[in-house]
Amino acid sequence: MINRFKKPLTVAVAGCGLIAAPAALANEPSLNIDLRTFYFNRDFRQGSAEDSVAASQALRVDYASPYVNGLIGFDASLFGAVKLDGRGGDENSGVLKADGDDTEGYATLGQAFLKLKLGEATELRAGRMVLATPLLYDDDARSTPSSTQAIKLDTRLGGVDLYAIYSDRAANMAETSFKKYQANGEEYELYLLGGGYSFDNGLSLQAAHGVADDYLRQTYLNASYPFQLGNGDSLLLDAHYYYATDDGDLYGRDYQSSLFNLAGSYATGDLTLTLSYQSVGGDDGYDYSWDGFEHDNNVLMTWNSVQYLDFNSDDEQSLQLRADYEVAAVPGLSLMGRHTEGWDIDTATHSDAEERETNLEAQYAFQRGALEGLSLRARIAHIESEQFDNVDEIRLIANYGFNVF
C-alpha cells in the first residue's frame, strides 16, 4: 500500500529519537508562527491516472500556555491554507482541501488540548493534537500536518520514557473535520502503549504496541547504536521491526504481515553514506494505517519508506543507497540523493515484480540577517514500478518560522 501523502525527510533520519517525556515541563507562554509556501507537481508517465498540480500558501499558529498554579494549561494551533493553483487531479494531492473534483483553501483548529501536569516528569493531554510516536505519527509533508483527537499520558520512570494513547478520531492533512475510525460501516477506537530508553553508551531502544478494536493490531521495535570510529568518523546501525495481524471481523479477512529494516549510516566530515535493507514477510504487504488512510495519515518509520514508495508490498525486498552532504562552503546548504530498488514483489499478475525510486533533494536555511528563519527546499522523485504507475514528482517548499513571544 502506498501512502501518497508521505512523510518529511527528517522523520526517517531521526527515527530513533521520537520519544521524549516532558522531563522539564515548560511553564512560560509561547506563540510561534510558521508560513509555508508549497508547490506540488505529479506527472503520471503512463496509465489512466490524472496528472496533478497544486500550490498553496499555508499558515500555522502555535500557542502554548503556562500551567495555571503549576497544574493545568491549554495549547492550541490554527492550521490554514490559501489556494494558489490547482489543476488536473489536484484533489488527490493532499495540498488543498478536496471538494469533489475540485479543491479549495481551508482553515481548522488543528490542535486544541488541555494539559495537566502530574509531577515533574508526567503530563496528561486531552483533545486535538499532532502526535509523533512510531505507531501513530501525524504527517507534515504538505501544507499543514494531519492531527489526532486523543488522550495521551507521557511520563518518565527510572530513565524510561513511557506513553499511553487513546484515540477515537483523526483528521488527514487539509481536512477540517475529525472523523471516527471506521471499516465496513463500523466504528472503532485505538489504544497504544510505548516507551524507550537511551543508555549512556548511545544505545537506544524503543517498543510500541497498538490495537484498533476488532480491526488491526501492530507491534513496533527499534534499536539503534552509534559507533565512534576516530577522527570524527562514526557508524550508526539502526534496526526497525513491525508486526501486524487483524484483530477481528472489521478488517474483512485474515491478515498477518511483518517488516524488517536494517540501515548502516557512515559519517565522515560533511558526508554521510547510508546502506539500508528492508524485507516484508507474512501473507501480505505491510499495512501500517489504522483506517486505510481515510483519515489516519500514519507514516512508516523505516529508511526505505521514501518520498513516494514505501517498499512494503507482499514479500518485497529492497535495498537503498543514500548520500547526504552538508556544503561547508555554503553554511545552511544540504544535499541528499538516494536510490531504492525493490524486487520479489507478489502481485495478482506477477510473482517477482520490481519497482525503484530515485530521490534528489536540496535545502538551504538562511543563517543570519533579516531572512534568518527562512528555509527553501526542493524534492524530486522518479518512480518506476511494475505494480503502480510510473511517476515523476516535484515538490518546492519555502518555510518561514518565527517566535512572537
Question: What residue ranges belong to the model's regions?
Answer:
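Beta-barrel outer-membrane channel/assembly domains of diderm bacteria
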Residues: 11, 15-128, 155, 325-328, ...
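Transmembrane beta-strand segments that form the barrel wall of outer-membrane beta-barrel proteins
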Residues: 37-39, 124-138, 162-168, 193, ...
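Residues that define the transmembrane beta-barrel architecture of outer-membrane proteins
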Residues: 53-57, 106-110, 145-149, 156-158, ...
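Membrane-embedded beta-strands of outer-membrane beta-barrel proteins
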Residues: 61, 112-114, 151-153, 162, ...
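Repeated loop/turn-to-beta-strand initiation elements of outer-membrane beta-barrel proteins
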Residues: 70-74, 120-124, 159-164, 171, ...
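Solvent-exposed loop/turn segments connecting transmembrane beta-strands
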Residues: 118, 138-145, 169-172, 185-187, ...
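Outer-membrane beta-barrel translocator/channel fold
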Residues: 163-190, 232-314, 378-396
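C-terminal structural cap/anchor segments
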Residues: 284-350, 357-367
